[in-house]
Design a protein with these regions (language model features):
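Charged helix-capping and loop-helix junction motifs
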Residues: 1-4, 32-40
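His/Asp/Glu-enriched, well-ordered alpha-helical/loop segment
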Residues: 18-28, 36-123
């Protein structure tokens, strides 16, 4: 049934939004053990050509008061709950919080191109893999070509045996 439904979703050009934070906490919480993860069939939907994006709709409310609005955090959690940890799947996760979401919202001027609104973020990561793996800091948020938010990354120092070393966990 699910396979047939995915074909219908794709032909109807419907969009699927998965919300990893609240879904992982709220769905199936009355199940016995082993408990299901509360996550949809993301990999199967993507393989069927369905547009899937990641949402984060509960920030500080009664259903999920632990949210902080990090889309990279939501992608990281989905990476675990949907078992999308392959190197080739990291790009799909990033697309789900950018390109696929823009498609869901019918944004026509999306992307970095002449004439578009120049909305983008600068991440503290050397690779897309590290961006998702480390849920790195967003150094800059640029909206309509102007910096609207700037974050100084945290600095971690390990002190051991009289030595101090800076640790960033990057590969």
């Amino acid at each position: 049934y699910a396979f047939k439904l995915m074909g219908v979703l794709q032909r109807a050009s419907l969009n699927i939004i998965t919300n990893p934070y609240p879904n992982s906490v709220l769905q199936n919480r009355t199940d016995g053990y082993p408990r299901r993860r509360g996550c949809t069939r993301v990999d199967e939907l993507l393989a069927a050509g369905v547009n899937v994006c990641i949402g984060h709709d509960d920030l500080m409310d009664p259903w999920y008061p632990m949210g902080k609005g990090s889309m990279l955090g939501a992608a990281n959690l989905l990476m675990h709950t949907a078992q999308l940890s392959g190197y080739d799947q990291i790009g799909q996760l990033l697309d789900m919080i950018t390109v696929n979401s823009a498609r869901t919202m019918c944004l026509e001027d999306y992307g970095i191109e002449e004439g578009n609104s120049a909305d983008f973020v600068v991440l503290d990561a050397d690779t897309p893999f590290d961006a998702v793996r480390l849920t790195c800091e967003c150094l800059y948020v640029v909206r309509r070509g102007k910096i609207v938010c700037e974050t100084a990354p945290a600095r971690r120092e390990l002190r051991f045996g009289g030595r101090t070393e800076t640790i960033d966990f990057k590969l």
